[in-house]
Amino acid sequence: MEIGISIEAENKVGVLHKLTGILSELGGNITYTQQFIKDDGKIGFIYMEVEGIKDIEELKRRMESCECVKSFEIHSSLKKIYGKRVIIIGGGAQVAEVARGAISEADRHNIRGERISVDTLPIVGEENLYEAVKAVATLPRVGILVLAGSLMGGKITEAVKELKEKTGIPVISLKMFGSVPKVADLVVGDPLQAGVLAVMAIAETAKFDINKVKGRVL
């Protein structure tokens, strides 16, 4: 069983080592972690997803007995709460339309028990888009990327190629000028339809298989 753990602890040397040591001693394997320091600089927030912990009560006792721990909570993992993610990047107007289609379709599947979330980044400029696409590889739980705009090519195309090679994340592109549509898995003319298809491509309760339409323009 995989669980989510949220910890607020003192921001000082050795704290993270101590906390992960407790998890290791209890047979826990950390599958995902994220940390950041709060604005005051004195407290750090640590989120971890852990599998293999059999004695939850002992975990609570060990964590709460640490002087460096200010708060500790066990909950469902983000994978279970938010599920797979549709990432939509590009020009604001096109991103909004794709998101509208994706959210409507995600609602249908989430009602049936799935968990699909939709993330958007309205952004323009080749360098900005290049960095955004490359960064998708570092995001957790990404199921598919949709690129929405009227012109994308150059470094953005290289970033798409690299993303697909490294992660295998499928990419849908709106019909646009530039070379990005040539390297996308699917090109869609209607932004609303692109959003719907993006969700269907990663939904377990849908029968759409993006691999069967690779390279097509809809």
Swiss-Prot record:
Domain ACT stretches: 4-83
Pfam families xrefs: ACT_AHAS_ss (PF22629), DUF5612 (PF18462)
InterPro entries: ACT-like_dom_sf, ACT_dom, AHAS_small-like_ACT, CheY-like_superfamily, DUF5612, UCP006363_ACT
The protein, known as: Uncharacterized protein MJ1458
Source species: Methanocaldococcus jannaschii (strain ATCC 43067 / DSM 2661 / JAL-1 / JCM 10045 / NBRC 100440) (Methanococcus jannaschii)
